[in-house]
Curated annotation (Swiss-Prot):
A motif ('HIGH' region) lies at residues 65-75. It comes from Mannheimia succiniciproducens (strain KCTC 0769BP / MBEL55E). ATP binds at residue 612. The lineage of its organism: Bacteria, Pseudomonadati, Pseudomonadota, Gammaproteobacteria, Pasteurellales. Zn(2+) binds at residues 905, 908, 921, 924. Its cofactor is Zn(2+). This is Isoleucine--tRNA ligase. L-isoleucyl-5'-AMP binds at residue 568.
Length: 938
């Protein structure tokens, strides 16, 4: 018999109220540092390595950031993306080590150290200077390392790779030796990017383009023999006056080095009468040149094809020698005159075309960017300083046709932000055509998966157009070009490959200083008198470009396997991706990576680049101090990284809102798992209530999509699916419905344990979905989940305890989706009733659902449990024909809501058949004092 409890007023102790120590507020900025300490005190990374042992490997090779300065938001994006991939690959069942690295040699560090201790060989010896550079780089690495760790990035931070580690320096030299062995190295004088402030050559990736105002001049080159020139043209009229070829340039300082005039063999050229003079111009550019120089009328006197004009001679404007017309395909009709001033010292195209004609260099400019004595009128002047003098000289000799100013894009040094020049210097190169390197690299590009796919076309174009790679630098702090060359012939020592390995062994023991300390006699014996050590250092892009060999092939964690992925910002197509591709192809005939993923740059809320002058810089440190690392990570994951990544306070607040929804879902799950022991209380799938089985099936389907999105690096899709699951499928439907069953049924009833079983499965899955992105929060949740488990979520694979609904299940997903449609329509009507003050809350309502046959059959399956789905005190189904209200927004449904006339149960708050306001409803009487109510569906 059921005993009446109508006199009892407080029923709180009879309810299964949610309870958890998991805090409602994340307080991430305060809590995360403590979690990090726990991770490192307990050697988390090594535990992940141990748990992954023997699994299929996935190697993401870290592109080394430069060891200088604090990390910026772009660094944070890069490291977080890598960390998400490493953690998700671990969860997908891979062994995925992460060895962070740093680029430690090169000019920026030299400049910082110069500011501290002076230039090498002035106040301090070169050896001491290198030691100071090493010390400075080490300090920078430690500072950046702390910031990267604070982001929640897991890796072997105690054993990173540094390009200045002795073993790495030695292996860089060995990679150089392999390139030499394969015949890719040569020495030559070629025009290279030259920074006057650095007094050194620059790599392509160290060049930035900024707008600059330059002189724009048209210059006459008088014909050396007018009749010889005229004879090559088909003339319709002789014309009158002096005959000149006209060139256009924005670099007057290069004119002293002019050695030729390039024309296109396929273009038509004309002799044109401009006033009292005759000019040779490309036929299609005559009109634009006339406008530029202020000539209103002109007359074409004759024409000729470019190929017919080869080797015609013209006088240099101010030196006593002639320059020839030479043929070059680089001459276009994009601007100018169709005749290109050619100075092989100062332009790549100029150098290539002049070489075909055996035209040598002028050699007028020294390392300091000043003209030498051979430049005569301009001796001692800096190149840009000389611009004015050249213009004066041109005007003096009558060669200056027109002078204007032009604003145009011009190459600048990435470090000094000052304009650079092209300058021919003796350097060491890896030849793009040597041994077919260019074609082999292009072939390898096609074997790589590029993410996004436009990356392939981008790097292909760069490889097609790039010049030979100048790998030598005239610096102090860098890996040496470890070669001995003959003092007279400049030929390499016949034992070069053997000597390179000997040097590598020395460097392995003592670092790069061993090269400069080395007495050539120690390796060469009597040969030392005839050979000298090369004083140059390797381009730092060679350092980082060779890490596929110096690190990936030599770290035991990688087991000699090649990298599966390189991941960097989109500027690295011409940087690290390029240098790595060229070197790996030169040494191993294959690309060093299977996949290359690039992310865009960060911009502010208005789409502007981060800039100190604008004052719009968002630093990761500020974000973490204000919001916490997980919010920064969630922003990165939820942003489509294939384009520009917009970050602002407003956007981060939106990320924080999304975070709260996820956290609240997790907290609800944990609070309702109070008292649940999976070993004791777990309900088998076939015994679970229908709605609970559906919820697990929902998680099963979500997990399949989330795993696929992680596997395809679509992290914004992961976040969207996570949000949909938490907010829509769970939050606005399932979790809302189960509250009554969870709180009011008997604590150990099937109805409640079935629900808790579903919640437990969902929580086990959810925490793993979150872990790669919301690492701190996932770790926190992990500590509150019931049941035996490993110490950290990061050693786990995705949860395998979810299940799909059986195909024979009549209440399948399609069924519940239709129920959701009905419930949404009921909610719309209830909301209107609330607005009309008919009811307060939904439990005050009784609803009648007038439904067509399809919906009637659907809803009647739930029987008396329909009211638990609508969360009303009563819900009954009648035929649509009996409706006394109009159909609503869903065809086939008409909903009527009235205020219940019954008493409110003081325990479950449903309005029912209790005799008065203090009496329990019959359902609660059964749950408190009887055997408990039964549920089958909801």
């Amino acid at each position: 018999m059921v005993r009446k409890m109508s006199e009892q007023k407080d029923y709180k102790n009879t309810l299964n109220l949610p309870e958890t120590g998991f805090p409602m507020r994340g307080d991430l900025a305060k809590r995360e540092p403590g979690m990090l300490k726990n991770w490192y005190d307990n050697d988390l990374y090594q535990k992940i390595r141990q748990s992954s042992k023997g699994k299929k490997s996935f190697i993401l090779h870290d592109g080394p950031p430069y060891a200088n300065g604090s990390i910026h938001i772009g660094h944070a994006v890069n490291k977080i993306l890598k960390d998400i991939i490493i953690k998700s690959k671990t969860a997908l069942g891979f062994d995925s080590p992460y060895i962070p690295g740093w680029d430690c040699h090169g000019l920026p560090i030299e400049l910082k150290v110069e500011g501290l201790v002076g230039k090498p060989n002035q106040k301090i010896s070169a050896a001491q200077f290198r030691e100071e550079c090493r010390k400075y780089a080490r300090e920078q690495v430690e500072g950046q390392k702390k910031d990267f760790i604070r982001l929640g990035v897991l890796g072997d931070w105690d054993n990173p790779y540094l390009t200045m580690n002795f073993d790495t320096e030695a292996n860089i030299i060995r990679a150089f030796g392999k390139a030499v062995a394969n015949g890719h190295l040569y020495k030559g004088s070629k025009p290279v990017h030259w920074c006057l402030d650095c007094a050194s050559s620059l790599a392509e990736a160290e060049v930035e383009y900024e707008d600059r105002t330059s002189p724009s001049i048209y210059v006459r080159f008088a014909a050396a023999d007018e009749s010889a020139v005229e004879n090559k043209f088909v003339l319709t009229e002789q014309g009158k006056g002096k005959l000149s070829a006209v060139i256009w340039t924005t670099t007057p300082w290069t004119l002293p080095s002019n050695k030729a005039i390039s024309i296109n063999p396929e273009l038509e050229y004309q002799i044109v009468q401009f006033g009292d003079e005759r000019f040779i111009l490309a036929a299609e550019l005559v009109e634009s040149v006339a406008q530029a120089v202020g000539v209103e009328s002109w007359k074409a006197l004759g024409s000729a094809k470019g190929s017919d004009l080869e080797l015609l001679q013209f006088k240099h404007p101010f030196y006593d020698y002639n320059v020839p017309f030479i043929l070059g395909d680089h001459v276009t009709l994009d601007g100018g005159t169709g005749l290109v001033h050619t100075a092989p010292d100062h332009g790549q195209d100029d150098y290539v075309v002049a070489r075909k004609y055996n035209i040598g260099m002028a050699g007028l400019i020294g390392n300091d960017g000043k003209f030498n004595s051979n430049a005569k009128f301009f001796a001692g002047l800096g190149v840009f300083e000389a611009n004015g003098k050249v213009l004066e000289k041109l005007d003096e000799v009558g060669a200056l046709l027109k002078l204007e100013k032009i604003r145009h894009s011009y190459p600048h040094c990435w470090r000094h932000k000052t304009p650079i020049i092209f300058r021919a210097t003796p350097q060491w190169f890896i030849g793009m055509e040597t041994q077919g390197l260019r074609q082999q690299a292009l072939s390898e590009i096609k074997k790589v998966r590029w993410i996004p796919d436009w990356g392939q076309a981008r790097i292909e174009k760069m490889v097609e157009n790039r010049p030979d790679w100048c790998i030598s630098r005239q610096r102090t702090w860098g890996v040496p070009v470890a070669l001995f060359i003959h003092k007279e012939t400049e030929q390499l020592h016949p034992r070069t490959l053997e000597l390179i390995e000997e040097v590598a062994k020395l460097v392995e023991r003592k670092g790069i200083q061993a090269w400069w300390d080395l007495d050539a006699k120690d390796l060469l014996g009597d040969d030392a008198a005839h050979y000298s050590k090369v004083p140059d250092t390797l381009d730092v892009w060679f350092d980082s470009g060779s890490t596929y060999y110096s690190v990936v092939k030599n770290r035991p964690e990688f087991n000699g396997k090649e990298a599966d992925m390189y991941l960097e910002g989109s500027d690295q197509h011409r940087g690290w991706f390029m240098s790595s591709l060229m070197l790996s192809t030169a040494t191993d005939n294959k690309a060093p990576y299977k996949q290359v993923l690039t992310h865009g740059f960060t911009v502010d809320g208005q789409g502007r680049k981060m800039s100190k002058s604008i004052g719009n810089i968002v630093t990761p440190q500020e974000v973490m101090d204000k919001f916490g690392g997980d919010i920064l990570r969630l922003w990165v994951a939820s942003t489509d990284y294939t384009g520009e990544m917009t970050v602002s306070d407003e956007i981060l607040k939106r990320a924080a809102d999304s975070y709260r929804r996820i956290r609240n879902t997790a907290r609800f799950l944990l609070a309702n798992l109070n008292g649940f022991d999976p070993k004791r209380d777990l309900v088998q799938a076939h015994e679970m209530i229908s709605l609970d089985r559906w919820a697990v099936d929902c998680a099963f389907r979500a997990q399949a999509e989330i795993k696929e999105a992680y596997d395809n690096y679509q992290f914004h899709t992961v976040v969207q699916r996570l949000m949909k699951f938490c907010s829509v499928e769970m939050g606005s439907f399932y979790l809302d419905i189960i509250k009554d069953r969870q709180y009011t049924t008997k604590a150990d009833s099937l109805a409640r344990r079935s629900c808790q079983t579903a919640l437990w499965h969902i929580a086990e899955a959810l925490v793993r979905w979150m872990a790669p992105i919301l690492s701190f929060t996932a770790d926190e949740i992990w500590g509150y989940l019931p049941g035996e488990r490993g110490e950290f979520v990061f050693t786990e694979e995705f949860y395998d305890g979810l299940f799909a609904l059986d195909v024979s299940e009549s209440l399948d997903d399609a069924y519940w989706q239709q129920v959701i449609t009905v419930r949404n329509e009921v909610n719309r009507v209830l909301e209107q009733a609330r607005n009309d003050k008919v009811i307060g809350g939904g439990l005050e309502a009784e609803v009648t659902i007038f439904a067509n046959d399809e919906y009637s059959a659907l809803l009647n399956k739930l029987g008396n449990e329909l009211r638990f789905v609508t969360i009303t005190s009563k819900a009954e189904v009648k035929t649509l024909a009996d409706a006394d209200v109009a159909e609503g927004e869903v065809a086939g449904l008409a909903i009527k809501a009235i205020r219940s006339a019954n008493h409110k149960c003081p325990r479950c708050w449903h309005y029912s058949d209790s005799k008065d306001a203090n009496s329990l409803c019959s359902r609660c009487e059964e749950n408190v004092n009887g055997n408990g109510e039964e549920r089958r569906f909801a």
